Amino acid sequence: LGWEILPEEHAARVGGGDFGRTHPDGIWGDYIREVNPAGETVWEWHMHENIEIEKYPNAPMSGTGEWGHPNSVMLNHDGDVMVSWRHNNLIAVIDKKTGQFNFEWCGFELGFQHDFQVLENGNYMVFVNQDPGPGAGSKVLEFDPATKETVWDYRGKPRYTFHSPFISGAQRLWSGNTLICEGMWGRIFEVTPDKELVWEYVSPYFT
């Protein structure tokens, strides 16, 4: 996963964003490159060449100097590429054969998300940094990719007790429990499927 300066004709089509942060050379976009053990490129995908730029503007409260801001990439069970783009509130799966999305979810309800991944049961999971609703809070969301219906989620009770507006992630453990990183506060904790806290660590260092 890498960043690149967009060609001017593509950069001119990028919309949205609120902040005035810019790069002197233009607007950053991104690409994905797969290499073999010898370091040779075997597959490459550039966002601005494969999707409709106007359909995915930067969300409000995101910068204008970068389009997308991808923050996670992995393969699903079919070998296709799962990507999270924070600035667009977009998660999608790229068909490696066509270069097009075969799954996408774009909306404010994803809340500048991180750590989009597939679970062993075939469901998808994502860390929603800014979970919409009254008060500040985050959410770990497991959902059925065929319907986008919630299978399981975790929120703080009350909401503000679990909130990281940036970084962060979650991992489903072999036991069925979920390990969660609340990145802003250096907190790692484990919860059961019934959302019971069974382990917790808070780093004494803050950077």
Which residues are covered by each model-predicted region?
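Histidine-/acidic-rich catalytic cores in large beta-rich domains
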Residues: 1-207
